[in-house]
Every structure is written in C-alpha cells, then in structure tokens.
Amino acid sequence: MSQVIIIGYGPAGVSAALYTKRAGFATTIIGLNKTALFKAEKIENYYGFKEPINGAQLFKEGIVQAKRLGCNVIEDEVISIASESNFKVKTATNGEFTGAAVILATGKQRFTPNIAGLKEFEGRGVSYCAICDAFFYRNKKVAVIGNGAYAVAEAKELKAVADVTILTNGTASEEVKLSGIPYLDLEIENIYGENKVNGVGFKNGHTLTVSGVFVAIGSASSIDFAKKLGLFVENNRIVVDAKQQTNYPGIFAAGDCCAALSQVCVAVAQGAVAGLSAVEFIRNKN
C-alpha cells in the first residue's frame, strides 16, 4: 500500500511527490506521457534555466528526480477511484493501488468529438459521467462513445442498470473487443432527438435508438474523477482551499485542474502545497 497516490505526473504531480516522499511517505505516481507540459516546444519563463528548455525534457527531468527519491512511478491510465476505508485507484493494466490520500493532478482537458448534436443535447441525454447519471437510465438503452479502457470502465458501470453499447467511431481497440460488451465500429454522423436524445445516426445511414449517450473518449481527467467523487467543480475547475484540499477529506488537487493560470510555476507551487497538506492529513489521521 502507498500512503499517497498521485494521479498525473506533470509538474504538479511530481512536485507533490517530492514533498510526500521526502516526508517519509510511500508515494505512487500514476500517469501518461500526454501532459500539456510534454507538448510545450519551449519554456523560457521558469526559474533557474539560463537557456530555454522544451517541455518534454523538463517532464523527463521531473520523472528522473521522483524516481531518484524512491517514488513508485507507473505509466498507466487510471480508470476509476473509489473511497472505502482508504482510497482505491484502479488502472488499465497495473491493477489496483490503495492509499490514505489522493492528489489529483492530471489537468482538465477533455477531448470533445465534433459530432452533430453532442453539445445540443448535453444535460438532455448526453452525459460525461456514468456513475453520476446511470440511475436515470435504468432498464433503458444507452451508448458509450469511446474506444479505450476508460470507455470500457464507463460501459461496465452502466451495464449494471442499462442495455449498453460502445460506439468506437472507427476500428475497435483490443480493450473494447475483449470487454464482452456489445460494440459498433461505425463512424458516427450525429446524435438526434427532439427535446431529448432519441438515438445515434451513423455515416452509413444506420441508426441506433438510445435514451442516453455517455462520452468517454481518451483518458479520464481530474475533472472527470472529481465529478464521480462528488467534488465541487466550478467553471471546469476543481474547487480547493488554500491547502489544495477539496471538499472530500483526503483528496487534494493541484495544477491545471484547479488553477486559473496554466503555468508550470503555478502547477509546481500548488503541487508542493498539496503534497505537504496530504502529509499533514495522514499524520493527523493516524
């Protein structure tokens, strides 16, 4: 068991890990190479560098630093977080991790496909959170748009109450093929309905009648996890206090998922605060 689990290994996540690990707490960082920092061509406004550095290099240096201190760094996709006596974080390929505190630091980006009707029916049959809205579709037909581990996890959540089909919008991934959940690999044309969603249309002319459409494309962001856990979210940012604590005890957030300014220096500072706050939380809990 890790005492602290950090989801996201960009500057906020790694910064948090430096503080939790140096405080003597077993720390696991889970993330993918799909951070905003990794895509930055040149960074020249960060303290301590006499020459500009590209985002990929700064990212790699952070990972090396975390590993040198003894952090457990896992390259994987987090698909769910559950709270029991401790927090249980499930990944796509490395199983489940348990921790006394969780720090969310995966950013807030969510890819929204350019599908006609998607925006129009948000809140009227289009949802981004299975655990939040599954109840409303009990014994109904629903679709999940997505083509990876996150889409499969959302579909399994819905399967307990509804008749679910995964729509991969193209060639299905192995995760989808092996999930045991019905899927269609047709290209999506639109989501249609009148006052609410009635179905999904495909480019080959076929249609699928459903009452709800759940969007689960790519990997889940901190905002996705926040909504599933009942964390306060305003203006697409997780609400935190001065200690980076959310409204849920033991869950902290740092970086782009809660910051008004998307800068490396802000992410690093918030990560440090979140890490120290997680240490304080666990010590007080024990």
What residues fall within each predicted segment?
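FAD-site-proximal beta/loop scaffold in flavoenzymes
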Residues: 114, 120-135, 217-261, 266, ...
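Hydrophobic/aromatic ligand-binding patch that stacks against planar heteroaromatic rings
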Residues: 15, 19-20, 102, 157-158, ...
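Beta1-alpha1 glycine-rich phosphate/pyrophosphate-binding loop at the start
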Residues: 4-57, 65, 140-174
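FAD-binding core/adjacent interface of flavoenzyme oxidoreductases
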Residues: 1-7, 72-139, 214-216, 238-246
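A Rossmann-like FAD-binding core segment of flavoenzymes
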Residues: 37, 63-84, 89-91, 96-97, ...
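Short loop/helix-cap segments at secondary-structure boundaries that form the rim of catalytic
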Residues: 39-40, 114-119, 135-137, 158, ...
